[in-house]
C-alpha cells in the first residue's frame, strides 16, 4: 500500500506539489524599490530632529545575509539630512554645516561621534555618522532619575577627555548639553552636534558670538557683550552637565519668580546673585569640583588640567592621562590594522559607490556626489624625469613631456641616443676624477659667442628664439636649456658656463649618435690636461631650482667671463666650434648633450683653445660628430665692424687629407661635401696684404714679449710637423681605397661645412644622391646668410702630438701670459664676412699649388661614389 505525503502549508491547507513546500514569496525589484533610500543607504525611522532637518537611521540597501550566522546584520548609521533649499538663502547656516563637517574630519576620539562620509544630491546633504544605539544621554538620566556617583564619575571623565581633545585641536564646541550627548551600546559617552564649533587662536581665543542653550551657556555669553574665552565657556557647560548627572535636575532652577526658566535675563541675574545649592545626596568631593567649575567669573573658573587632577576623578586618572597625540596615534594604528585585515562584506560601515573606498553599491547608479571624510587631497609634486638629460623647453607641460605617447609636433628622442648620453655622463665624471689626480694647473678657457645670428629658416617647434643654452664643464654638470636644469653630478665643484643664443631654425631628427669605445682610451689623455674654472663673480644657477623662463643670460662683461684665449701655435692648427644652423642639421633639433669623440691621444691643451675631451657634454656644441665638420677661426675685435678670418691653408690641406684618407672608417660619421678652391673668388694682392696686416695686428695684441718668442718657435715647429703629416697622409691615401659610411647619403644636410660668403649662391649644387629628403616645407636657402662651422677638432690634437715637450711647455707659459694681458675678445657668428679677409693665409703658404692638386684628387675620388 502506497503512502502519499501531504505537507501542510503555512496557511493551513495541504498540497501534493512539493515545489511549493516551505517556499516564501520572493520580493520583486518593484517591491525592493519601495524603500526610501539615500545613496547606498536605506532610510529607516527618525532618530531625532534638529535645526536643519531630521536624523534618520540607515543601513545598506543591498544587504544579504551571506554568512552562516543568524544575527549578522549590517552596521547601522545615523544620517543627518539637510535640505539644500533651507541653507541656500542663509549663508550662516551653510557655514555652520561645513564647519561641523570639517571639524569632524579632524577629530578622532572614542568619545566623539565618528564621521563616516558625506553625501549630497540635488535636494539633500547627508552627513553620515556612526549610530549610537544607546540613545540620548538626557533620556537616560530621566529614566534613571540620577546616576550613582561611580557611574557618574566614569561618564564625566569621558566627557572631560573628549572636550580636552577638542580643545587640543584648536576647536571649541560651544553647545555642550545633555541633548548633544549620546550613549553607545556599551553605555559610553559620545559627544555630537558640532553645529556651533569654532576655531580659536592660542594668542587670542576670545569670541563674540553668543551661542548655546539656556541654562548650559556661561553667564559671560548672556550678560556681557564683550568677547569671551570660549574654552572657559565649555567648562561651565560641563559643570552644568555634571550637576544634572548627580542631582537629576539643572542648577538654579529654584527661582520662584522664574520657575520654568523661560526668562533668560532673569535666570542669569539669579545665577550671578545666588550661590550654588546642592542636594543632600551629593558628597563633598564632587561638590568641591562643582563649586570650582560653576563660577560666574571666567578668570576664577577652573581649567581642564586642574579638573583632570581633581581628587574626585582619581579612579580614572589613567584614562585621563592619555594625551591627544596618543589618541591620534592609536586611531592611526587601528586604521592600519583595520585596512590590513580582511573584512566581511557588511562588517563595517557601508561605503558610497562614488567614494574611492566604496564597497556597498559599486554597480548602482545614483545622482549623488560623495564627499568622503577620509579623503584629504594633496597637490601632486612636480614630476621630474631622471631619464632625460635635457628636457623640453618650458612651454611644454611636464605631463606632456613625460607622456609615453609620441606627438607629431614633438621631438622624438631615440632610446640609443639617451643611453649613450647617460653612459657618457658617467664616463665624463670618471675622466674628471682621473684628470684631477694629475694636479696640473688649470687653464681657464671660456669661449663666449655673441653678436648677430641671422637665420633663413622657420623656427622649429622645439626651440624658441629666446632659448638660452648654457654649457658647463664636467667639473659641475649643470646644463640649462630654456628652463630645464640637469641635476649636477658634483655639487661642490665650480662651474664654467658658455652661453649662446639659439636662433629659429627648422627642426629635424637627431642623426646617429655613435659612441665608439675605442676612442675612449685615446681621449683620456686629453681630458687630463683640460680644465675650466668659473669666475668668482659669476652667479651659478641653483641645481635644484626650476622655474620656466626664470633664467636669463647675464650681459657680456669682460670682468665676469674670462676671455677666449689663443696662442700663436693654435692659429696654425686650432679648430673652432660651430653652430651650423642649416636645414635638417642635427643641431636644429631639440637641444641635447652631444658626444664629442676625439680620436687622437694628444695631451696638449695648447694645441687647441677649444679642446673638448671625450665624454664632455654641452648643448652649445653641435650634435654631429666633430670629425665631419670644418671651418675657420674667426677673430673679432670688440669695437670694430669688420670681422677678420684667419685662414690657414696648411691646416685646410691637412684637414681634408685626414678626412678623405679613411682615418674615420671606424667611426659612423657622415661624409663631408666641401667646396673646392676653384669655386672661391681669386685673391688680389691687396686682399692678401690686408689679411696679413690683420694677423700681425692680432699677434701684437695677443702676446707679450715673453710669449712672442715661444709662439714663433711653436709656429715654426707646427708648420714643420704639419708638412710631414701631410706627406704621410697623401701616401696613405694613395694606397688605400675610398672608405665611406652608409650615412654619407645624409652628408649634404648633416655635415655641410665651410664659410659661406655672398658668392655661395653661385656655387654648384651637390649631387642629388647626397641630398636628404626635407621634412619641412619651409626650407629655403638664403645666399646672404653665412654660417661659421666647426673645424675638425682632432687636427689640433694631431699637431700637438708631434710637438716636442719643450715647445709645449713654452706654449703653456705663453698662454698664461696672454691670459693676464688680453682684453675683450670673443668668437662670434656673423651674417657677413669681409671679402678682403678671405684666405689671407694663402699668400704665406708655399704649397698653394700642392693643396689644389690634393683637393682636386680627393674631390674626384669622392664624386665616383
Curated annotation (Swiss-Prot):
UniProt keyword Transferase, yes or no: yes
Binding locations of ATP: 47-55, 80
Reactions that this protein is recorded to catalyse: L-seryl-[protein] + ATP = O-phospho-L-seryl-[protein] + ADP + H(+); L-threonyl-[protein] + ATP = O-phospho-L-threonyl-[protein] + ADP + H(+)
Molecular function GO labels: ATP binding; protein kinase activity; protein serine kinase activity; protein serine/threonine kinase activity
Active-site residues, Swiss-Prot/TrEMBL: 175
Residue ranges constituting the Protein kinase domain according to the UniProt record: 41-313
Sequence ranges of Basic and acidic residues compositional bias: 690-708, 724-733
Location(s) in or outside the cell: Cytoplasm
Enzyme class: transferase
Modified residues (Phosphoserine): 441
Keywords from the UniProt entry: ATP-binding, Cytoplasm, Kinase, Nucleotide-binding, Phosphoprotein, Serine/threonine-protein kinase, Transferase
Low complexity composition bias: residue spans: 352-361
Main location per the UniProt record: cytoplasm
A GO cellular component entry from the record: cytoplasm
Region (Disordered): 341-398, 480-554, 673-733, 754-782
Biological process terms in GO annotation: peroxisome inheritance; vacuole inheritance
InterPro entries membership: Kinase-like_dom_sf (IPR011009), Prot_kinase_dom (IPR000719), Protein_kinase_ATP_BS (IPR017441), Ser/Thr_kinase_AS (IPR008271)
Domain of life: Eukaryota
Biased composition (Polar residues): 494-538
EC number, as in UniProt: 2.7.11.1
Note: Present with 556 molecules/cell in log phase SD medium.
Similarity-based family: Belongs to the protein kinase superfamily. Ser/Thr protein kinase family.
Subunit structure: Interacts with FAA3, POL5 and TPA1.
Function recorded in the entry: Putative serine/threonine-protein kinase that may be involved in rRNA transcription and ribosome biogenesis.
Descriptive protein name: Fatty acyl-CoA synthetase and RNA processing-associated kinase 1
Organism: Saccharomyces cerevisiae (strain ATCC 204508 / S288c)
Amino acid at each position: 500500500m502506497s503512502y502519499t505525503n501531504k505537507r501542510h502549508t503555512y496557511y493551513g491547507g495541504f498540497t501534493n506539489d512539493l515545489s511549493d513546500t516551505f517556499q516564501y514569496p520572493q520580493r520583486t525589484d518593484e517591491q525592493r524599490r519601495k524603500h526610501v533610500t539615500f545613496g547606498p543607504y536605506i532610510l529607516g525611522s527618525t532618530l531625532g530632529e534638529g535645526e536643519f532637518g531630521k536624523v534618520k537611521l540607515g543601513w545598506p540597501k543591498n544587504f544579504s545575509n551571506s554568512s552562516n550566522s543568524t544575527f549578522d546584520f549590517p552596521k547601522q548609521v545615523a544620517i543627518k539630512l539637510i535640505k539644500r533649499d533651507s541653507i541656500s538663502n542663509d549663508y550662516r547656516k551653510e557655514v555652520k554645516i561645513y564647519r561641523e563637517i570639517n571639524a569632524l574630519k579632524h577629530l578622532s576620539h572614542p568619545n566623539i561621534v565618528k564621521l563616516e562620509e558625506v553625501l549630497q544630491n540635488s535636494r539633500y546633504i547627508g552627513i553620515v555618522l556612526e549610530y549610537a544605539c544607546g540613545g540620548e544621554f538626557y533620556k537616560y538620566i530621566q529614566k534613571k532619575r540620577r546616576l550613582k556617583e561611580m557611574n557618574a564619575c566614569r561618564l564625566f571623565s569621558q566627557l572631560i577627555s573628549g572636550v580636552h581633545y577638542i580643545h587640543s585641536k584648536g576647536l571649541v564646541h560651544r553647545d555642550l548639553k545633555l541633548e548633544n550627548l549620546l550613549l553607545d551600546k556599551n553605555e559610553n559617552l559620545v559627544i555630537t552636534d558640532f553645529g556651533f564649533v569654532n576655531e580659536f587662536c592660542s594668542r587670542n581665543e576670545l569670541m563674540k558670538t553668543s551661542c548655546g542653550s539656556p541654562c548650559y551657556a556661561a553667564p559671560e555669553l548672556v550678560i556681557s557683550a564683550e568677547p569671551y574665552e570660549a574654552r572657559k565657556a565649555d567648562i561651565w557647560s560641563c559643570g552644568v552637565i555634571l550637576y544634572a548627572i548627580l542631582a537629576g535636575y539643572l542648577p538654579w532652577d529654584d527661582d520662584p519668580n522664574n520657575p520654568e526658566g523661560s526668562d533668560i535675563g532673569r535666570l542669569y541675574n539669579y545665577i550671578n546673585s545666588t550661590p550654588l545649592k546642592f542636594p543632600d545626596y551629593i558628597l563633598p568631593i564632587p561638590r568641591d569640583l562643582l563649586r570650582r567649575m560653576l563660577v560666574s567669573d571666567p578668570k576664577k573658573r577652573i581649567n581642564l588640567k586642574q579638573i583632570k587632577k581633581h581628587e574626585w576623578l582619581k579612579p580614572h586618572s589613567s584614562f585621563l592621562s592619555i594625551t591627544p597625540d596618543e589618541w591620534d596615534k592609536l586611531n592611526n594604528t587601528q586604521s592600519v590594522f583595520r585596512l590590513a585585515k580582511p573584512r566581511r562584506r557588511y562588517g563595517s560601515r557601508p561605503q558610497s559607490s562614488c567614494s574611492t573606498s566604496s564597497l556597498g553599491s559599486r554597480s548602482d547608479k545614483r545622482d549623488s556626489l560623495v564627499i568622503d571624510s577620509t579623503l584629504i587631497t594633496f597637490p601632486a609634486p612636480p614630476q621630474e624625469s631622471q631619464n632625460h638629460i635635457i628636457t623640453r623647453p618650458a612651454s611644454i607641460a611636464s605631463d606632456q613631456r613625460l607622456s609615453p605617447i609620441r606627438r607629431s609636433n614633438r621631438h622624438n628622442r631615440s632610446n640609443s641616443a639617451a643611453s649613450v648620453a647617460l653612459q657618457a655622463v658617467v664616463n665624463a665624471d670618471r675622466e674628471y676624477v682621473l684628470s684631477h689626480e694629475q694636479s696640473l694647473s688649470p687653464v681657464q678657457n671660456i669661449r663666449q659667442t655673441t653678436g648677430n645670428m641671422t637665420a633663413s629658416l622657420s623656427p622649429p617647434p622645439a626651440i624658441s628664439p629666446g632659448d638660452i643654452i648654457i654649457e658647463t664643464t664636467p667639473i659641475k654638470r649643470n646644463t640649462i636649456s630654456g628652463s630645464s636644469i640637469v641635476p649636477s653630478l658634483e655639487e661642490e665643484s665650480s662651474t664654467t658656463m658658455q652661453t649662446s643664443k639659439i636662433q629659429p631654425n627648422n627642426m629635424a631628427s637627431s642623426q646617429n649618435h655613435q659612441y665608439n669605445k675605442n676612442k675612449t682610451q685615446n681621449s683620456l689623455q686629453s681630458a687630463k690636461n683640460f680644465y675650466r674654472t668659473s669666475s668668482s663673480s659669476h652667479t651659478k644657477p641653483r641645481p635644484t631650482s626650476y622655474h620656466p623662463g626664470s633664467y636669463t643670460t647675464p650681459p657680456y662683461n669682460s670682468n665676469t667671463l674670462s676671455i677666449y684665449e689663443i696662442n700663436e701655435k693654435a692659429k696654425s692648427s686650432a679648430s673652432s666650434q660651430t653652430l651650423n644652423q642649416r636645414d635638417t642639421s642635427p643641431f636644429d633639433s631639440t637641444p641635447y648633450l652631444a658626444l664629442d669623440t676625439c680620436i687622437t691621444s694628444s695631451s696638449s691643451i695648447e694645441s687647441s683653445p677649444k679642446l673638448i675631451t671625450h665624454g664632455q657634454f654641452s648643448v652649445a656644441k653641435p650634435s654631429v660628430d666633430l670629425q665631419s665638420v670644418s671651418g675657420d677661426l674667426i677673430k673679432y675685435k670688440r669695437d670694430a665692424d669688420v670681422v677678420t678670418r684667419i685662414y690657414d691653408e696648411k691646416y685646410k690641406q691637412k684637414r681634408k687629407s685626414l678626412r678623405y684618407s679613411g682615418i674615420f672608417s671606424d667611426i659612423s660619421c657622415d661624409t663631408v661635401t666641401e667646396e673646392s678652391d676653384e669655386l672661391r673668388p681669386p685673391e688680389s694682392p691687396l686682399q692678401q696684404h690686408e689679411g696679413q696686416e690683420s694677423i700681425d695686428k692680432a699677434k701684437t695684441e695677443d702676446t707679450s714679449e715673453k710669449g712672442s718668442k715661444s709662439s714663433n718657435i711653436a709656429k715654426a715647429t707646427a708648420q714643420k710637423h704639419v708638412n710631414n703629416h701631410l706627406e704621410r697622409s697623401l701616401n696613405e691615401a694613395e694606397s688605400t681605397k675610398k672608405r665611406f659610411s652608409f650615412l654619407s647619403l645624409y652628408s649634404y644636410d648633416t655635415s655641410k661645412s665651410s664659410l659661406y660668403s655672398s658668392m655661395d649662391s653661385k656655387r654648384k649644387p651637390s649631387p642629388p644622391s647626397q641630398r636628404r629628403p626635407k621634412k619641412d616645407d619651409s626650407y629655403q636657402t638664403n645666399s646672404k646668410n653665412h654660417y661659421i662651422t666647426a673645424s675638425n677638432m682632432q687636427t689640433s690634437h694631431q699637431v700637438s702630438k708631434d710637438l716636442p715637450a719643450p715647445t709645449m711647455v713654452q706654449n703653456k707659459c705663453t698662454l698664461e701670459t696672454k691670459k693676464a694681458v688680453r682684453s675683450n675678445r670673443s668668437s662670434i657668428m656673423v651674417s657677413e664676412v669681409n671679402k678682403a679677409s678671405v684666405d689671407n693665409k694663402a699668400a704665406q703658404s708655399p704649397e698653394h699649388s700642392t693643396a689644389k692638386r690634393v683637393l682636386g684628387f680627393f674631390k674626384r675620388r669622392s664624386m665616383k661614389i
